[in-house]
């Protein structure tokens, strides 16, 4: 994705800086994820998804804590408890991790969300609600990538690196859900100040 490597570095530095003063548990977790770059929040989502053995999309506190530890999130148990309780609104002892990830995403304008979903729909050729790696390969324009432009990477390397953003090293299922796509671009979005630049970047990369 054109320009995102630089944005990623800047965002990581800014996030680490903000982390030293942030007190809200949600903000602190969000910053820890963003300090890893655009794919940080999506990566945490993958960890939770792998742990969700029975596919009910919920986690109890023990699983939640294990997920944070597996993702090497630095957080006191008390802070994790406070975070968990905020999402366990009905006091059932479980949280819906989709709702949790939704809150964790950096806020985005409607215009940004619309262009992200427009790109998703274009890529989802079969209309079955998931994008396959093959779908991406057909549409993603690698020639806009700065490392391709300066001769550092081949087109194939750009694809591989880009697809790695969507696929977890522990769970390479080759499928990208709307949530994963949105989580990834919420991270990219956090590093880009203006809607106009974000929309131009999406339109160019996905030929919208």
Curated annotation (Swiss-Prot):
Subcellular location: Cytoplasm
Pfam family, one: EF-hand_7
Binding site for Ca(2+) 2: 88, 90, 92, 94, 99
Keyword line: Calcium, Cytoplasm, Metal-binding, Repeat
Metal-binding found in the keyword field: yes
GO CC, any one term: cytoplasm
Source organism, top-level taxon: Eukaryota
Parts of the chain that traverse the membrane: none
Gene Ontology MF, one: calcium ion binding
Residues given in the record as Ca(2+) 1 binding sites: 52, 54, 56, 58, 63
Domain EF-hand, first and last residues per copy: 39-74, 75-110, 111-146, 154-191
Protein name as it appears in the record: Calcyphosin-like protein
Taxonomic classification: Eukaryota, Metazoa, Chordata, Craniata, Vertebrata
